[in-house]
């Protein structure tokens, strides 16, 4: 039987704006600001480190004096030091601000649970959605908090990618075309594969709920006497083990699907790097580059491929986290069957 797929209600851009509104509502507007500053600092660290050696070689090649070489080293090393210091400081400083935003969402979920009407509170689909929303806000690794970290990583990769692309514009139009084609192919293939978890989230939630139910009942002090008297321990263990095996099979299916994402990434990265090195070496042997330009472009090719993979990887991560945010939004925005306010008081 063909499984029915469910399209996400909100896209990544809509969820980004929604998270910005949540940060503002929690009086934590500094969270996105910290993310942008750290992205700029980390991008500056990589770019200044990349430019340091080629600029020194270029100064020597141009016959520059010692003072100019020393000034070049001082400027680039200073930028590298400042950007590294800012990145190190912002590694842990914004953590509590991100926690505040996540806890604000937790409070909204709890409030929704407490005030929803009885028909919704007894609806199995609503209860399943509630459980998924709670799981999406359980810890620091959940989308409600990790979204900011991965958004910063995406901004870092995107900024670095643009700079390295500008550095390679003087190489070959065919090279840039090949990079664009392989990038587009990788993005659209991975986009389809990475949505597998969202399309099967109901199946995973059902298995997790069953395991939690059996575990809670087995640890219940109220039912402990009946479990011992009627010898129910082997039966409970059998039910739990059966459900655990089913969940392991589900995880194995998921990882097999995600494995092909890594295979496609590796294949397209090999093609992309091979083409880049071929065009770069051919242009160098034809005499179109000096020593400094060759070193700069040679370093930029590796950094370009790395940041391109970073953009794609973080975009895939953000899309998966966006799917988790869709679950939270769907639960918080459930329409009530009754009008909960605005009525007239009873006489």
Map each language-model feature to its residues.
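Membrane-integrated ABC transporters
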Residues: 1-45, 66-71, 90, 123-162, ...
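Cytosolic ends of transmembrane helices, especially the final helix of ABC transmembrane type-1 domains
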Residues: 232, 276, 295-333
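An intracellular "coupling" helix at the cytosolic face of ABC transporter transmembrane type-1 domains
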Residues: 25, 29, 134-147, 199-206, ...
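Membrane-proximal cytosolic tails and large cytosolic loops of membrane proteins
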Residues: 1-22, 88-98, 107-126, 197-206, ...
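ABC-type nucleotide-binding domain
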Residues: 1, 344-347
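Juxtamembrane helix-loop junctions of ABC transporter transmembrane domains
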Residues: 49, 53, 82-122, 193-197, ...
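Transmembrane helix-loop-helix hairpins at lipid-water interfaces of multipass membrane proteins
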Residues: 32-89, 165-197, 271-278, 282-292
